[in-house]
């Protein structure tokens, strides 16, 4: 009998309050997993992190230097980490909170056009943007009076 997977085997998580380790950019992206450099570069390109990689390099230490990065860069590092974890489902909590509209739109187009399965919590949106999602649960519909 096969043992059921654990929660961490099924889900990867990215939030508006990213966890950044006092380690290299590479470690923060991969958590030490054996991931091909080409795959990491591809995800960095899609999430608009490639300029950071080219400027600082993967060995850039994010200890005290993390405060030199923008909130949007930190969120994108955590999102890249979640994607690179290669879990069946991504749980995304307000991943665009610190992103400008253009970057947010580009990242959402990447996610929507990918084969990734994700559940996303969003609070601020335009109704026309929601038409691209497979399903929507509006928690206001379940609010008790």
Model-flagged regions — what are they?
Residues 17, 28, 61-145:
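ABC-family ATPase nucleotide-binding domain "signature/switch" substructure
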Residues 18-61:
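Conserved "ABC signature" C-loop
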Residues 1-34, 122-124, 130:
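ABC ATPase nucleotide-binding domain signature region
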Residues 7, 53-55, 92:
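Short helix-terminating capping/connector loops at secondary-structure junctions
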């Amino acid at each position: 009998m096969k043992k059921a997977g654990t929660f961490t085997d099924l889900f990867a998580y990215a939030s508006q309050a990213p966890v950044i380790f006092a380690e290299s950019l590479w470690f923060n992206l991969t958590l030490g997993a054996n991931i091909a450099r080409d795959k990491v570069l591809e995800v960095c390109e899609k999430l608009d992190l490639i300029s950071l990689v080219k400027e600082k390099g993967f060995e850039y230490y994010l200890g005290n230097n993390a405060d030199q990065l923008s909130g949007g860069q930190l969120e994108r590092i955590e999102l890249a980490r979640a994607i690179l974890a290669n879990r069946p489902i991504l749980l995304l909590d307000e991943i665009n909170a610190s992103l400008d509209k253009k970057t947010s739109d580009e990242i959402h187009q990447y996610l929507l056009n990918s084969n990734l399965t994700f559940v996303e919590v969003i609070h601020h949106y335009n109704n026309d943007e929601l038409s691209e999602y497979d399903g929507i649960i509006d928690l206001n519909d379940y609010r008790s009076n």
